[in-house]
Structure formats: C-alpha cells, structure tokens
Curated annotation (Swiss-Prot):
Its EC number is 2.3.1.74, 2.3.1.156. The lineage of its organism: Eukaryota, Viridiplantae, Streptophyta, Embryophyta, Tracheophyta. InterPro entries: Chalcone/stilbene_synt_C, Chalcone/stilbene_synt_N, Chalcone/stilbene_synthase_AS, Polyketide_synthase_type-III, Thiolase-like. It comes from Humulus lupulus (European hop). The active site is at 164. PANTHER family: CHALCONE SYNTHASE 1, HYDROXYMETHYLGLUTARYL-COA SYNTHASE. Component an active demethylxanthohumol (DMX) biosynthetic metabolon in glandular trichomes (lupulin glands) that encompasses a chalcone synthase (CHS) and a membrane-bound prenyltransferase. Interacts with CHIL2; this interaction promotes catalytic activity. This is Chalcone synthase H1. Highly expressed in glandular trichomes (lupulin glands) of maturating cones, to a lower extent, in petioles, flowers and stem apexes of flowering plants, and, at low levels, in roots and leaf blades. Disulfide bonds: none annotated. Its main location: cytoplasm.
Amino acid sequence: MVTVEEVRKAQRAEGPATILAIGTATPANCILQSEYPDYYFRITNSEHKTELKEKFKRMCGKSMIRKRYMHLTEEILKENPNLCAYEAPSLDARQDMVVVEVPKLGKEAATKAIKEWGQPKSEITHVVFCTTSGVDMPGADYQLTKLLGLRPSVKRLMMYQQGCFAGGTVLRVAKDLAENNKGARVLVVCSEITAVTFRGPNDTHLDSLVAQALFGDGSAALIIGADPIPEIEKPIFELVSAAQTILPDSDGAIDGHLREVGLTFHLLKDVPGLISKNIEKSLVEAFKPLGISDWNSLFWITHPGGPAILDQVESKLGLKPEKLRATRHVLGEYGNMSSACVLFILDEMRRKCAEDGVKTTGEGLEWGVLFGFGPGLTVETVVLHSVGI
C-alpha cells in the first residue's frame, strides 16, 4: 500500500514551470493614434465638443502610443449607435459581440503558440483563460476548448473581470498547476476586446476619456510546463516565484463596473504615484532570497498602464532608459491591452534578443521581473530566469 506522501511525490514535477511557447494576435483593424481623435469625435457625433476634443488630442499625443488594433470598425459602430453614446443602454449588444470575438481572438494566439511548441494539442492538460471583456456561461475557456478541438477532459480555469494585473496572475496560477502536476502542459490565454468599454466622450468624466486614449485589443497565449523534454521542447523563460499584494491606501484607485452601459472605468487617485511609491517593497521581497538589490541588473517586463506610470517607476528606481525598452515598444505598437500586455512584452523581448544575438532571452541577463498592475490597486510580481539562446 502506498502512502499519500508517495502519491504526492509522484504527482509533483521536479523542475520549475517554464514558458515553452508564445503566440500573439490582434484584430485586423488598425488605428493610428495621430488620426484617432478626429475619428473618435466624428463617429460618436461629438464634434461640437471642441474643447474636449482638444483635450483628447493632447491625451493621445502624450500617450506614447503610435497605433492600436480594434475589433470595433466604423461599420460596426454605425450599426450599434448606442455604443457611441456616453451612457446609453448597450450591454446586450456589447455582450453579443465579445462572447464570440474574445474566444476567437484567443484561438488565433493559441494556434500560434501551439505551432511554436510543436507538440500535439492532445498533450495540453490544462487551460487558463483570462478576459476582462464580457462574461458568459459556459465561459470563454469552454468556447476556446471547442474552437481548438481540445480533449473534453482538459482541466479548465476561467478568470473574468480581473483587469490589467492579470497577465501576472495567469503566470502565477499556471506555475502552480505545472509544478504540482507532473507532465502538465498548461495553455494560458489572455484575450481582450475594448467593445465593452468603448463609449462617447463626456465633459465630467475625463477618466473614461483616458481609457479611450489608451486601450487596444489583443490576445496572447503561452504553453507552460515543467521539466521540458530535451531536444523537443524549447524553454524561453523559467518562472521562479510569484506573489500578489494590495497596495496600501489605494482603495478605489482603479475601478471597473459592469453596468447596462457596458464596463465603466474610473481612475480615482494618483495611480502612477501609488505604484512608484510601493514598487520597491515588492522588488525587495521578491529578490532578497536571491541576494539581488541592483534593479538595473534585471531584465524588465512591466504592464505599461500609461507613460506616466513607466516614467515614475523608472525615476523612482533609477532605472536606465533601456530597461523599459520592450515595455515601451509594446505600448507604442499596440496600446494598453490590459491582461495581454505583459505576455506581448515577453514575446517582444525574446524576439529582439534572438534578432540581436544576445546570449539569453532576458537581454543577455540571467534574472528578470514581470509586474502586473490593476484594480485594487493589485500588484503581481513574477521572478523570471532567462535561458540561453
């Protein structure tokens, strides 16, 4: 007769959870940030709000975003005028859209990740799906399983309404799944579509206008597993540790509420200041066990939020400008894609490292950090270990 401890030992993987493949996808519709204010005020029938339009132009100009991708085309918005009003009942139309499009965009990214991984999809044991765009039962995890033709016995976890920190959350959850289930291969998908948050401008709610200037659509997928099969699976990054915390004195700093008018978004406090003031504590807790205290010795992947957050974090920690290159690049090319952002940045970093011929996937460095920030204010901190290229 075996003991419970013997069973547990046999169930556990030996090595750390490892990212084995990354895939990304966006809708085809690309919008240039320089042209967006004119388009946005025209499509929402708000061109008479000239002062507000000038304010929005300044927001877009300071955003450091060059372009974004959006499922919502001009044709779709003309067919759904309530989406263009500031607070018209429109939840049904938004839901009808996203419950179909979120899994579809997730499938695109997942298909790319599975192709890079190179193993049969029947080897996928777990699915972790994350979106802040809409809610449904059965969820986007179920729809993705059907779209990809995964085994009906695949173990699914659906994460709705987490917000911008959740790119870190999915890594933390996948790490625990991979390390506690020997042979597990976890498909992680973050898929976000702004159809739930798009609305016309309003003079008294500038935080809603900030969201219109920053958010874009995108989906990213990873394959995560421990103990990669030599010569068959190719490690990209190892997940060494993961933590989550709520920042002090940050209640109500970022709020999102699902209402008849869609998902409303509120920024109520100095979010960049709160994050930059508290970030070092998370770094110290994560890296003290490794004996690391030089933040410039790490490679950096951080949820971009907006340029003010990046500027204040960079200043507070004394980071060299090149530390946030990959993060700023993704913000510029895609905008803020909520939970998917940090996974896009992982992909950008490993791609650029291979292109430049540096010795590791982490810009030639061994250790790195991934940060997710979002409602709460909640911070996810993931310690990464690069692999040789």
